[in-house]
Amino acid sequence: MRRRIRTAYGSALALTLALGAAACGGGPVSTAGGGDGKELAGQTLTVAGVWSGAEQKNFQKVLDAFTEKTGAKTRFVSTGDNVSTVVGSKIEGGNAPDVVMVPQVGVLQQFAQRKWLQPLSEKTRQAVDADYAPVWKSYGSVDGTLYGLYFKAAHKSTVWYSPEAFEQAGVRPPATYAEMLTAGRTVSDSGLPAFAVAGEDGWTLTDWFENVYLSQAGPQKYDQLAQHRIKWTDPSVVEALRTLGALFSDKKLLAGGQKGALATDFPGSVEKVFGPEPEAGMVYEGDFVAGMAKDEFGKKIGEEAKFFPFPPVGKGAAPVVSGGDAAVVLKDGKNQKAAMAFLEFLATPEAAAVWAAEGGFLSPNKALDLGAYSDATLRSTAKSLIDAGDTVRFDMSDQAPAAFGGTKGAGEWKLLQDFLRDPSDPARTAAALEAAAAKAYQTANQG
């Protein structure tokens, strides 16, 4: 997200600002149940999230649809990447938002452990049971209680490429990880570096690792590592780092080499492939690449910007890594009724369809008609996410305590940047990751 899904585009451009939405007239009956559709009139719902730029603009349309439906005014506050710190300071200052769009499972769990959250309503729970794969309920729950509704998801197992670059090199979308590296070297030989890697943003490197690890080590090991039930010094981690290091150490594969990758942020990596002066043929990241290629560089998705699924590594299965933003209700918010009604609204395909029509969005809600998405590529990625069901695995770094998996210049982000700079010793990197993880989990458990 975040960060990331997601959140990724928004986190890369995050600005701290607060926008107000003007109240609209009463509309149909509120999703809160009963009444004349105006029972929330006079209330102002404050929603905090990481989004800015195009993502914030599109989410505002969802807020406006809620206003039209219920009469409640809305106000969005952008937190930037440090959601936990910003929300904590607002709670301490007596100015807590009513709803927070949380981009990390670890942060949601942290909020619940601190007793900041309200359990979701029965109506929302019923919608989740009916219309979401069980994995999404699991990621939104703490100790069996549902606190988070996943409204926006990301398919983070997509590799985006320039069809022109592939045509020039005479290569096709690869079916395996080894084929992807071979195709990349062929693209490089044709005159254009293979991959634009956004090494300046450490979260993109965690996504690279997670796809390799899920495919190579398998979902059981992935779950164990995500929960720190095995150590980062496990041989499976070292092997995944070795696999990733083969890419990071190959100057034919990285636009600008390791130094260039470390100086490239996420928006810059997309620009290197789809901008006016291409510097690479491929960029790995989630489906949200499409929104940026379209909005920022005017590319026709499916024609001038295409993707292939992140290919399987060795004998493993193709990975499906996801991320997402979960809506939670804060106990200290001043408008509990409006907050609960808003989450009931977000649980409907009606709410998801508002953003789906704008692009840069996927919903884990199975009840959303795929025809709501604005183009065939989005429909394809959305179907892949839904069809994966419980084989989807949530972004591992987002499940970790923020000190390890979600802090710029620290923990996993920094250590994988160090590994990109020098990938010669995977075992040493694994040991450093374990030391940082052990410290972060110990602190989180004490808290």
What would you call each of these model-derived segments?
Residues 219-296:
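Extracytoplasmic ligand-binding clamshell segments of periplasmic binding protein
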Residues 39, 121-132, 199, 216-240, ...:
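Short, solvent-exposed loop/beta-turn-alpha elements that line the ligand-binding surface or hinge
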Residues 65-132, 167-175, 272-274, 281-282, ...:
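Extracytoplasmic "Venus flytrap"/periplasmic binding protein-like
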